């Protein structure tokens, strides 16, 4: 039995979504796959599931009743620590495999279970990564339900309403700094700033407004406006303390051949995303600045079993 799930790009709204603001994401065509077969004891890639690198897999196993121990094989094309939802993709693919062994998979159930896994492992978190990996395509997260509601997730008096949103087919250039940063501490540091710094709290609210304006610009195919909003979103994320000199270097390099660029994901390293109609030139610009660059495209398929 096997299942796969996509990585994700947050186009607008990372960190602000934790505080109930809007965020916009899309699944991308880099996927994680998890294969399972019966075995005398639980194993992951031949090793113990107690190894720290399998903490998401182990927490996912605890969510699903299985008939017995399994040998799991994890294959992921989503680079770890790059801000592209690698842990969410592996978590969702693991849950998809485990549920699939019972007969069928349900994206809503898996999205909720995967969010609980990430919350347990990371601490304070939002469901945007795990819901995008579960549903595929474009997702808009709002504090209140509107049209095209997929599901609602609640935790600790907070509520996120996940909506399907139709985005035009888009290619994005990713610039990976090669610097990894743990999501949990970054989220905790932003929380501390927002609770004690009025400017940080206002930045979070502005990011929420930018997200809705950015969605409108993308729907109108106004890439110039969308790029400007990405640039502003990056500046606000830097104000929240999740920037890094290498992120700024790659953003500046990418902007010379694109409509706009910003960090994507938790920050502190990881990746930048650029909106460009000259992707080959943007890739070269990022590489010249010291980053690893590649092009991804939106993926409409979420969690799915493999034949």
Residue ranges and their predicted role:
Residues 28:
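Short, flexible loop/turn motifs enriched in small residues
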Residues 72-81:
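N-terminal pre-triad scaffold of radical SAM enzymes
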């Amino acid at each position: 039995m096997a299942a796969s799930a996509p990585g994700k790009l947050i186009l607008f709204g990372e960190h602000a979504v934790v505080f109930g603001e809007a965020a916009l994401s899309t699944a991308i065509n880099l996927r994680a796959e998890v294969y399972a077969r019966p075995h005398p004891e639980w194993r992951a890639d031949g090793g113990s599931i107690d190894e720290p690198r399998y903490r998401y897999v182990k927490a996912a196993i605890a969510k699903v009743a299985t008939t017995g121990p399994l040998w799991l094989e994890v294959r992921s094309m989503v680079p770890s620590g790059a801000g592209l939802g690698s842990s969410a993709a592996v978590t969702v693919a693991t849950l998809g495999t485990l549920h699939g062994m019972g007969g069928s998979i349900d994206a809503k159930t898996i999205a909720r279970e995967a969010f609980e896994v990430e919350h347990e492992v990371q601490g304070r978190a939002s469901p945007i990564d795990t819901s995008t990996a579960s549903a595929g395509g474009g997702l808009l997260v709002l504090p209140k339900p509107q049209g095209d509601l997929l599901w609602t997730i609640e935790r600790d008096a907070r509520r996120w309403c996940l909506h399907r949103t139709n985005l035009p087919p888009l290619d994005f250039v990713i610039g990976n700094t090669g610097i990894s940063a743990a999501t949990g501490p970054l989220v905790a540091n932003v929380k501390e700033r927002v609770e004690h710094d009025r400017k940080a709290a206002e930045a979070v609210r502005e990011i929420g407004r930018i997200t809705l304006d950015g969605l409108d610009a993308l729907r109108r195919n106004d890439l110039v406006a969308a790029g400007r909003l990405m640039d502003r979103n990056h500046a606000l994320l830097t104000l929240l303390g999740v920037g890094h000199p290498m992120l700024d270097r790659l953003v500046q390099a990418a902007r010379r051949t694109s409509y706009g660029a910003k960090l994507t994901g938790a920050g502190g390293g990881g990746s930048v995303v650029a909106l460009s109609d000259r992707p080959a030139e943007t890739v070269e610009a990022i590489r010249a600045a010291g980053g690893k660059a590649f092009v991804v495209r939106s993926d409409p398929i979420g969690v799915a079993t493999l034949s």
